[in-house]
Amino acid sequence: MNDSVRTTTTISSTKSLVHSFQLSAILHLFLLISFTPMSAAADQHASHATRRGLLRKLGLEHVPVQTGPSIDVPQHMWDIYDDDNDVDWVRHYYPKEIIEDNEGFLLSYNLSLAARNAHNEEVTKATLKLRLRRNNKARRSGNISIYFFEDDINNDRFQIESRSVDNLTEWIDFDVTAAFLRRTNRISFFIDLPEDVEIEETQSSSLSSLPYARAQSAPLIVFSDLSEPSSVRRKRSAQTGNSERKNRKKGRKHHNTEAESNLCRRTDFYVDFDDLNWQDWIMAPKGYDAYQCQGSCPNPMPAQLNATNHAIIQSLLHSLRPDEVPPPCCVPTETSPLSILYMDVDKVIVIREYADMRVESCGCR
């Protein structure tokens, strides 16, 4: 292995351990405030510190403030969440403006809320979903054409897809990925519909603007991946993905069946978002098995402790010079991601995969 490859590998491993240490510190603080008696002031301070730490881990500066009437997460977003598509971000937008004229509908979407990550995100897929209906019983053939405006100033529009309406279903998906070849904070689509077809007005709308009943029938779903060269992404294995889906549906704590031991090991720890009063914006999961690492790293080091050579040497030196050399620590050695479905500001529904959220194994380091 050459020096450049060795250096890259070391940096990636170090960053992964740093993320694991950060998560462990946050979880231990959460554990302390959950079970340690404190004064009211100390408890409030610790709670705020835990929330700030978790928000930073989630890439947020503040809890998304929800204003106006609440909205329900549509079924197609629940389906995406349960499918484990292995994408970093999925965002769901409703149009901010709908203009109808004799030719069709103009739909405008505000994407500026995602601007904080625009420099390191790459759109991999974008889908415009339309719920359509015929305004009379006569069935006429025709096409639905989707155009997007590349330049707001010149109003130049380009067709990106056309579809027959001979077999009109409740929802029709249009691939509009081509509209995201450049980064933008606002995007507009023109929908050219046959005379006997229109966008459905949803009766069960919980918001009342645009009119929002029609906006709910024209969501834009954008899939994107982080494109940072230095980012360490951990793809969930099939086994991990299956267990995560089961945990989502069951919502129960997983109890470790291993025998109690003082040696370094993974132990149960469940994070309940309701305890943080985040149930208003985190839709799923309600909580998750984060696990934690506890136990000692003695000398001689048992083989099952998954210790590095450095930890073995450090343990030996600690036994000889305990005042000078600290013992190795029991820390996460392998972690897995967690997908969270939450409501961002301005009613943008987000699914995001966060790395290093669940401890899979522990060892001495």
From Swiss-Prot:
Coiled coil: none
Cell location: Secreted
GO molecular function per UniProt: BMP receptor binding; cytokine activity; growth factor activity
Gene Ontology, cellular component aspect: extracellular space
Propeptide: 43-244
Signal peptide: 1-42
Keyword Secreted recorded: yes
GO biological process, one term: positive regulation of DNA endoreduplication
Statement: the UniProt record of this protein carries the keyword Transport: no
Domain of life, source organism: Eukaryota
Biased composition (Basic residues): 246-255
Pfam families: TGF_beta
Phenotype seen when the gene is deleted: Reduced body size. Abnormalities in the male tail. Disrupted aversive learning.
Carbohydrate-modified residues: 110, 143, 167, 306
Region described as Disordered: spans on this chain: 231-259
Record-linked CDD domains: TGF_beta_BMP5_like
Positions of disulphide bridges: 264-330, 293-362, 297-364
Principal localisation: secreted
Tissue occurrence: Expressed in embryos just prior to hatching and remains constant in most cells throughout the larval and adult stages. Expressed by AVA command interneurons.
Protein family per UniProt: Belongs to the TGF-beta family.
Subunit-level organization: Homodimer; disulfide-linked. Interacts with drag-1.
Function: Ligand for the serine/threonine-protein kinase receptor type-1 sma-6 which activates a TGF-beta-like signaling pathway. Multifunctional protein that is involved in body size, male ectodermal patterning, innate immunity, lipid metabolism and neural plasticity. Dose-dependent regulator of body size, probably influencing the sizes of some or all cells rather than their number. Plays a role in patterning of male-specific genital sensilla (simple sense organs), known as rays, and mating-associated structures, spicules.
Protein name: Protein dbl-1
Organism: Caenorhabditis elegans
